[in-house]
Swiss-Prot record:
It comes from Helicobacter pylori (strain G27). It comes from the Bacteria. Belongs to the UPF0102 family. InterPro entries: Restrct_endonuc-II-like (IPR011335), tRNA_endonuc-like_dom_sf (IPR011856), UPF0102_YraN-like (IPR003509). SUPFAM superfamilies: Restriction endonuclease-like. This is UPF0102 protein HPG27_782. One of its GO terms (molecular function) is nucleic acid binding.
C-alpha cells in the first residue's frame, strides 16, 4: 500500500468532493464514497438510471491523469467491486468509470473496461 503525505491526500479528497458535485449535476445519486477492501478502494459509487457506477477519480495539472489508471489498477478495482457485491445486492447492473479532473475541468469516461 502506498502512503501519501497530508497535502497529497487533501488534494485528492478535494478533487473527489468536486467530482461528487459534478456528478450530481449529471443526475447521479451518490451511494457511497471511499469503499475499501483488502484489494483497494473505489472512490465513488453512484447510481444513475438503475446502473451502479464505480468511479475512479484522477486529478492532475502537469500530466494527463487518465494514465494513472493502469491495467493493474483496473484489476484491483474489479476485485474490490466483487467484495462490494458480496456485501450488497449482487444483481445490480454496473460499470466502471473514470472521472478526470484537470485544471478545474471535468471529463467523465464511462465504461472504461472492455
Amino acid at each position: 500500500m502506498r502512503f501519501f503525505n497530508n497535502k497529497h491526500r487533501a488534494k485528492g479528497l478535494k478533487a473527489e468532493e468536486e467530482a461528487c458535485g459534478f456528478l450530481k449535476t449529471l443526475g447521479f445519486e451518490m451511494v457511497e464514497r471511499n469503499f475499501f477492501s483488502q484489494f483497494g478502494e473505489i472512490d465513488i459509487i453512484a447510481l444513475k438510471k438503475g446502473v451502479l457506477h464505480f468511479i475512479e477519480v484522477k486529478s492532475g495539472e502537469n500530466f494527463d491523469p487518465i494514465y494513472a489508471i493502469t491495467p493493474s489498477k483496473l484489476k484491483k478495482m474489479i476485485k474490490t467491486i466483487r467484495c462490494y457485491f458480496s456485501q450488497k445486492d449482487p444483481n445490480s447492473d454496473f460499470c466502471i468509470d473514470a472521472l478526470i479532473v484537470k485544471n478545474g475541468k471535468f471529463e467523465l469516461l464511462e465504461n472504461i473496461t472492455f
